[in-house]
A protein has these predicted regions:
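Helix-loop boundary and gating motifs at the non-cytosolic
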Residues: 2-52, 194-232
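C-terminal transmembrane helical hairpin of 12-TM major facilitator-type secondary transporters
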Residues: 258-296
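A late C-terminal transmembrane helix in Major Facilitator Superfamily
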Residues: 310-336
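Transmembrane alpha-helices of Major Facilitator/SLC transporters
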Residues: 53-60, 231-250
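Intracellular juxtamembrane helix-capping segments at the cytosolic ends
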Residues: 109-122, 293-308
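Glycine/proline-centered helix-kink
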Residues: 137-148, 323-332
Length: 369
């Protein structure tokens, strides 16, 4: 048993490790579903979003799983991993689905507790939200960068690593008490939330990368240079991480970020329509994604500050589901509307203009408060 004081630094490290596991797992499952079972890529997004919605409902109303101590989730994950390892010779669609569903559900609940702890115990709410976003994007960058090698690794090798990690984490003394972030939040009364439009804005500012990266990949395939596809994934992620590191050191005015976001969004729209130099499109998209994440951090920080602290756990989960839900809705719309990606750019610009308008109109109570 390791006796370690639970602090923000350790919580961030655990958050990074668990998020990295989910990112690697997401890459592995995506490759499996596309290459073996011929499922559309959005099917994985649908599964993860439904899980996140369940966690939100459980956090806000049911309290079935989210009231359980963190250490017990590690025990469950260890037992489940051992069972999955024993049954590894019977891999089929249901095996893979169950494997992903259980892992994503349990790890996401643990991440929610660590997420809330970092926000509560950091020197400021903004610092906590920025740290969470930085570590989340860093883990995705590392996890997705390994995506091209995922199919070469057997599932039992993953399971051995996972079991070792969960045993190690469960042995920490920090998980043997119920910290305050694991407590039940008050049942959410949605009408009591202030500035609910922030939820919509943060959702609308996301999604560009989800739709444009596949389009870029298609362009590479058409030019017979698909081997460079990993760069398309890597550059936006790296840009986000570097920009978040920059914003941790320097406080950049929200209105300036919004104006640059709107300008880049419109410029990117023109370049895409005119099919201008692909590398330039990738760079501009990366900047748009990075600025969008920065805007989202400021909006989420404001929303957490102005609303009841008893709802904080539910609020954190709201922001985990808002963007995926928006993406899924647009994905279904895209089945009937051609060039949906172009409309998303217009939606992004309109959302940013709305936030800028609200911020300029209410100078005494800006979204920076």
């Amino acid at each position: 048993m390791f006796f370690i004081e639970f602090n923000v630094k350790l919580a961030r490290s655990l958050y990074l490790c668990l998020n990295l596991i989910l990112s690697v797992l997401y890459s592995y499952i995506t490759v499996k579903f596309i290459s073996v079972y011929n499922f559309p890529i959005y099917f994985i997004l649908l599964i993860t979003t439904l899980i996140e919605i369940f966690i939100f409902l459980d956090t806000s109303y049911f309290r079935i799983l989210t009231s359980i101590k963190t250490k017990y989730f590690y025990y469950i994950l260890i037992v489940f991993s051992v069972v999955v390892f024993i049954l590894k010779n019977n891999i089929n669609l249901y095996y893979v689905l169950t494997f992903y569903f259980v892992y994503y559900l349990l790890i996401s609940i643990v991440l929610l507790n660590y997420n809330l702890f970092v926000i509560e115990k950091s020197k400021s709410i903004k610092a906590g939200v920025t740290d969470i976003s930085l570590y989340s994007n860093l883990s995705k960058l590392l996890g997705f960068s390994l995506g091209s090698y995922i199919y070469k690794v057997n599932i039992d090798e993953y399971l051995i690593v996972f079991i070792i990690v969960f045993v190690l984490f469960s042995s920490f003394k920090i998980n043997n008490f119920k910290n305050e972030t694991e407590k039940d939040s008050e049942k959410l009364v949605f009408n009591k939330l202030k500035r609910k439009y922030i939820i919509i804005n943060t959702a609308l500012l996301s999604g560009a990368a989800v739709f444009f990266i596949p389009l870029f990949i298609k362009q590479l395939a058409a030019r017979n240079i698909i081997q460079y596809s990993s760069i398309i994934f890597f550059i936006p992620g790296l840009t986000v991480v570097l920009f978040l590191i920059l914003t941790k050191k320097y406080d950049i005015n929200l209105n300036r970020i919004l104006m640059f976001y709107i300008i880049f969004d419109i410029l990117f729209f023109i370049l895409v329509i005119c099919e201008v130099f692909l590398p330039l499109q990738v760079i501009l998209l990366s900047l748009i994604v990075a600025l969008g994440v920065s805007i989202s951090i400021k909006l989420r920080t404001n929303f957490i500050k102005i609303n009841d602290k008893d709802y904080r756990k539910s609020i954190v989960q709201i922001f985990r589901i808002s963007a995926p839900v928006f993406t899924i809705i647009l994905s279904f719309v895209g089945l009937y509307v051609e060039n949906i990606a172009y409309y998303i750019l217009l939606i992004n610009a309109i959302s940013a203009i709305h936030v800028l308008y609200v911020n300029l109109r209410n100078r005494e109570h800006t979204l920076l408060d």
